[in-house]
Amino acid sequence: MRPFERVRTALAMWLARPVGVEARKVYWQRLAGGFVERYLSGPHILDIGYRGGNAQAVPIVPHAIGVDLDYPGYDGTRLPFADLSQDALFVSHCLEHIHDYRGSLADWYRVLNIGGYLLIFVPHKWLYERRAAPPSALNRDHKRFYTPGSLLAEIEESLPVNGFRVRHLADNDYAYDYERPIDRHPRGSYEIELVVQKIARPSYSHRLELPVGGPKDAKT
């Protein structure tokens, strides 16, 4: 899409779609900058936890299916969708509320097509919580605090070895007020952005999972 056409399309979508509160903060930038086009243009998209407590919220793109806890067949961990059926999953400010993060991450990976994208956004520990460890003073339902490193650690812990690639990882502090007192709710964006792409695991991948002290011919 040409830059002018992208901006025009982005403006129309930005005006028409009341997406979730956190996603809304940088929705225009992601639309106009090509982020949405790059990662969410496939025909089969899921927006997990899209309402975020706002009953009027809509999924991130018009053709996405919004999945919340009341979605038929969804138990909060396992999605009622077939293996290899989705081109992308958009998960904004949801993972930190999930106790069984391993189960959820593994299931999100399960439904992705080869080449599909898992987009995860979580509050940044030092931008949102601004404290070292739980409990959160701002949202008691937050099970864990995140830095980019700890988020990647959960991904590596939960997904198959050599079955994914990290395509994007960044701190999003757009319009963040660094001078706001620590006892006040932060303003602006305060999240970590992560995009993981599912790949076909190379034939040698099973050898990478062998424990230390395994067969002598195992190579890493």
Show the residue positions of the predicted features:
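Short amphipathic alpha-helical segments, especially helix-boundary/capping motifs
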Residues: 6-9, 81-84, 127-130, 170
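A near-ubiquitous, low-amplitude feature marking generic local secondary-structure context
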Residues: 2, 14-19, 72, 88-91, ...
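Class I SAM-dependent methyltransferase Rossmann-like catalytic core
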Residues: 2-39
